[in-house]
Design a protein with these regions (language model features):
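Short, surface-exposed beta-strand/loop micro-motifs that present aromatic residues
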Residues: 172-178
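Beta-strand-turn-beta hairpins that frame and shape the catalytic cleft
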Residues: 144, 178-183
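Acyltransferase
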Residues: 5, 185-240
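Pocket-forming structural segment of enzyme catalytic cores
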Residues: 93-171
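N-terminal beta1-alpha1 ligand-phosphate binding loop
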Residues: 8-30, 190
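Structural signature of beta-strand start/N-cap positions in the alpha/beta core
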Residues: 31, 80-82, 146
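Cysteine-nucleophile active-site neighborhood
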Residues: 53-126
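An anion/phosphate-binding loop that grips the pyrophosphate of nucleotide cofactors and donors
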Residues: 44
Length: 240
């Protein structure tokens, strides 16, 4: 059976914000498939690695299914690759959340707990700042776009050339990374109304696909009306 129709592969390793990501791509007219099949991942036009919860548990589940190698191979082949939330953190080498656990190591630095003098977790709507002027990831997004965050860890030590955006939560935190075919979003674009859909549409475009205009999509997802972005973070938990 030919499964090549799965143009974007969302890596299913038993943990993560899977269906929400799939529905978000569908909202911009892009077909995405939840899969743990390495052959499907290898032939996809783009690969998405979601993640929620604990870095060590996520990496353990990925390794157990031999999907860490599938992710490495996809990146090495030049397939567009997007890590979301813990999926972005898994692109790094290590995390203080799980000493001894080894990440994918695409970015050779550590993920650390947010400073003790800030509210943890960083949860709710916040604005991305310091957008890289040549960022394809944030193409078409207005200055300081609102995105939805839920995280307690972030990488404080990232090569500035790879930083696509930052966010201020008591301190400046890396909100997104962009390096060649690899993107990482610390926030949840699939939970971030039309601005998040714009970012996913940008990703689909890099995959050679033709997404629909995100402004025509209904991206409410229970958190905000489309195009309405609160001035203060929303205190609510994402249920995945």
């Amino acid at each position: 059976m030919d499964e090549r129709f799965a143009v974007i592969a969302i890596v299913d390793y038993g943990i993560g914000n899977l269906r929400s990501a799939q529905k978000a791509f569908e909202a911009v007219g892009v077909e995405a498939r939840l899969t743990g099949d390495r052959d499907v991942i290898a032939t996809a036009d783009g690969v998405v690695l979601p993640g929620v919860g604990n870095f060590g548990q996520c990496m353990g589940a990925l390794v157990e299914r031999d999907l860490d190698r599938a992710c490495h191979d996809a990146i090495e082949r030049g397939q567009p690759f997007l890590g979301i939330c813990v999926g972005m953190q898994m692109l790094f080498a290590t995390s203080d959340e799980a000493p001894g656990a080894v990440g994918l190591g695409i970015f050779d630095s550590n993920v650390a707990l947010l400073p003790p003098d800030v509210v943890v977790p960083h949860m709710g709507w916040n604005q991305c700042t310091a957008i890289a002027p040549d960022s394809t990831m944030f193409s078409g997004l207005r200055d300081q776009p609102w995105m939805y965050f839920v995280h307690s860890y972030a990488s404080p030590d990232v090569d500035e050339a790879w930083v696509a955006a930052r966010v201020h939560h008591g301190v400046d935190v890396v909100a997104a990374v962009e390096r060649a075919n690899v993107w990482g979003a610390q926030f949840h674009p699939e939970k971030s109304s039309n601005l998040g859909l714009t970012l996913l549409a940008n990703f689909a475009s890099t995959c050679g696909l033709e997404p629909t205009d995100p402004s025509h999509a209904d991206a409410r997802s229970g958190r905000s009306e489309p195009g309405v972005y609160p001035s203060e973070p929303v205190s609510e938990t994402i249920h995945d």
